[in-house]
Amino acid sequence: MELKLDYSQVRFQENGRLKLLIIVGTRPEIIRLAAVINKCRSYFDCLLAHTGQNYDYNLNGVFFRDLKLKAPDVYMDAVGDDLGATMGNIINASYKLMVQVKPDAVLVLGDTNSCLSVIGAKRLHIPIFHMEAGNRCFDECLPEETNRRIVDVISDVNLCYSEHARRYLNASGVAKERTYVTGSPMAEVLHENLTEIESSDIHQRLHLQKGKYILLSAHREENIDTEKNFLSLFSAVNAMAEKYDMPILYSCHPRSRKRLESSGFALDRRVIQHEPLGFHDYNCLQMNAYAVVSDSGTLPEESSFFTSVGHLSLIHISEPTRLA
């Protein structure tokens, strides 16, 4: 794939404000940064760049729609033929973009491959702000753990969700003046969208009864691509369907669907595969589920919010808990 690197038509407004480049690439980044992006546009001259890491509409565009976000100013289309090409494209494309637009600062969130765009910013001496800094699960088999360590170390300002995460960074050698506790922005995002979430008609559309279904999300590389983990996970899903005898709605990412099809694994008849849902629909399902089973890092934050507003969701997380 030939990577488009012509950003000559992309520019800041040059309105005298700090020029901030925000880089995203996946669903979790878009969701968590939604309120932050809108607030930053009030104070800074902002450009929003999307690497294209999540290239499916249901993992990308639907969230800009639901969260009422302006479309990205730049779409890098950096997905390559394999992981190495994609990672290289992300670093290359973001570097060329920064050379062209000359931002005063770069903001990223989390631990995805899109966050590796800050490597170019470091070489160009552009200050880097990293939200969700200091999170650790201490399992180096997970690709996100490597990304977390890289981005934390080279960022100029690490914005942590908790005092625990800040202390961890300080203990590992990151200077105190480079670490700040801001908390997670998820509560603001969910609060701003709570009316739309509660008014979703997704239960009627899917013919599900509130409190009488289990919501499943499983997409992590180590759970889907590793044969042993894949078989263990979906055997457990089938056992869960049999034990509880209720529908299990599986929000199935494209890679997970392909893996299930190629393996020939037979899911229990009560497991319903569904394409990934939008923000309002999915969270309405989550807040009214009998239980939520997920390997996502975002869903525990969402479910904890719904518990605080009176909706109980039970959570099982396949990834070791991120200490934050």
Regions found by a protein language model. Give the residues of each.
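Single conserved hydrophobic/aromatic residue that forms the stacking wall/gate
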Residues: 315-324
